[in-house]
Amino acid sequence: MGNWHEWAELLERVRGTKPLVHNITNVVVTNFTANGLLALGASPVMAYAKEEVAEMAKLAGALVLNIGTLNATEVEAMLIAGRAANEAGVPVIFDPVGAGATSYRTETAHRIAEQIQLAVVRGNAAEIANMIGESWMIKGVDAGEGSGDVVALAKRAAAKLGTVVAITGKEDVVTDGQAAYLIHNGHPLLTKVTGAGCLLTSVVGAFAAVEQDAVKAAVAALTYYGVAAEQAAAEAGQRGPGSFQVAFLDALARIGVDDVKREGRVEQR
């Protein structure tokens, strides 16, 4: 498929085009997601009303759906927006937050996957496993490490869902069901900042807005994000998660393609 170092250059394309990323995300992370996308160089919009989501989705470069704080009205808006995005050829990125934690959450994740053509599904191992009816340890909306081969799980999920799957954790995996890429960047402090995973999903959306190959977009996004986290931790990690969060937003804005190429650690499986 090519050298991942070349895919890192998508960062410049994102910053050059400033794609509009339409987020229907959860109330806990809205501000952090918007600020993170702005730091990256994308243009965020948070539109939830079912009366306007179809129109907004068609205007966007990507649509991001996140079920972190779902309710019936929001789910209806997601389905309307997703169908409109599919009609317009706009990539849809899905974050099945907490799939497996409750039956309603799991059923909603399945419903979205069945009714909308998804470009990328980004979640932790438990969420992805529950998306395809497999068991994995989960606690609330955050998963433990669980057990099993995450690469194999990701490939099964990609094949079953018909989409690119990105599983994030201590190591990140991106696959289309055939080739798989492991990204070894990141930092544990990301788990101490509410919305870090949700923002990552939206960052994948920004990269998918400028690159039709969803594997390339996801690998480039996750590598960039992980490098930014490592730089932020080196700068402010000892002061704690509050300082890290600020430093992380700064790093998202500061780092360039050369940083990603130099510090990225990507392995093909």
Curated annotation (Swiss-Prot):
UniProt-annotated binding residues for ATP: 122, 168
Keywords associated with the record: ATP-binding, Kinase, Magnesium, Metal-binding, Nucleotide-binding, Thiamine biosynthesis, Transferase
Catalytic EC class: transferase
Known pathway: Cofactor biosynthesis; thiamine diphosphate biosynthesis; 4-methyl-5-(2-phosphoethyl)-thiazole from 5-(2-hydroxyethyl)-4-methylthiazole: step 1/1
GO biological process, one term: thiamine biosynthetic process
Reaction catalysis annotation: 5-(2-hydroxyethyl)-4-methylthiazole + ATP = 4-methyl-5-(2-phosphooxyethyl)-thiazole + ADP + H(+)
Function field: Catalyzes the phosphorylation of the hydroxyl group of 4-methyl-5-beta-hydroxyethylthiazole (THZ).
Family matches, as Pfam families: HK (PF02110)
Cofactor dependency: Mg(2+)
Protein name per UniProt: Hydroxyethylthiazole kinase
GO molecular function, one term: magnesium ion binding
EC number from the UniProt entry: 2.7.1.50
Binding site for substrate: 46, 195
Organism whose genome encodes this protein: Geobacillus thermodenitrificans (strain NG80-2)
Family: Belongs to the Thz kinase family.
Superkingdom as given in the UniProt entry: Bacteria
